[in-house]
Amino acid sequence: MKLLIAYATTEGQTRKISQTVADQLVELGHQVELLDTARKRRDVHVDDFDAFIVAASVHQDRHQNEIEVFVAASLDVLKAKPGLFMSVSLAAAFEEKTADATAYISDFTDRTGWTPDQSLAVAGAVRSEEYDYFQQQILEHIILKDKDELRSDEPQEFTDWAGLANSVKEFLEPLDSK
């Protein structure tokens, strides 16, 4: 099967997640192409793919504009073929924020008009050494509020790699049996 993984990333974790999923799919015998939607490549034709994985991270309660533009431009094809949406956020890392992570997915599907076959809330990462003062304050006083054990100047990954791999396999199972 030929799959396109289209992604948008701000700090690089969604790129890492997309690459990891691509590697997994190749190991399973699939053809995979990665598309960074910020690069606006003209040589990728969505009609050429059998299924899609769309991945984007959440910043300031919204996914990147370029992924929404990609979905809008590809909507007819996306609706006609199997699709998985991966919404990457820190909200997905914390049980008490699950409703927020789910709301990000709902907002995305409402805005774009695309309802994928499966959606995943994927926990992201914190790279506080790259943040400006205001981002640091949001991280400390909102996102990691009451989570002193998680505060660190070192990068922290919250992505559940094994869980992600299992979810991708679940998405593929009905497609592989066709």
Predicted regions, residues:
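A structural signal for isolated positions on well-ordered beta-strands in alpha/beta enzyme cores
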Residues: 2-4, 33, 84, 118
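A short beta-strand-loop structural module common to alpha/beta enzyme folds
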Residues: 28-41
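Conserved beta-strand termini and adjacent loop/short-helix elements that scaffold enzyme active sites
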Residues: 6, 35-37, 122-124
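Short, glycine/serine-rich, charged loops/turns that create anion-binding
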Residues: 10-11, 39, 90, 126
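Short amphipathic alpha-helix with an adjacent loop that forms part of the alpha/beta core around
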Residues: 41-47
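N-terminal beta1-alpha1 ligand-phosphate binding loop
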Residues: 2-27
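FMN-binding flavodoxin-like domain, especially the glycine-rich phosphate-binding loop
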Residues: 28, 51, 60-178
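Glycine-rich, N-terminal phosphate-binding loop of Rossmann-like dinucleotide-binding domains
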Residues: 56-57
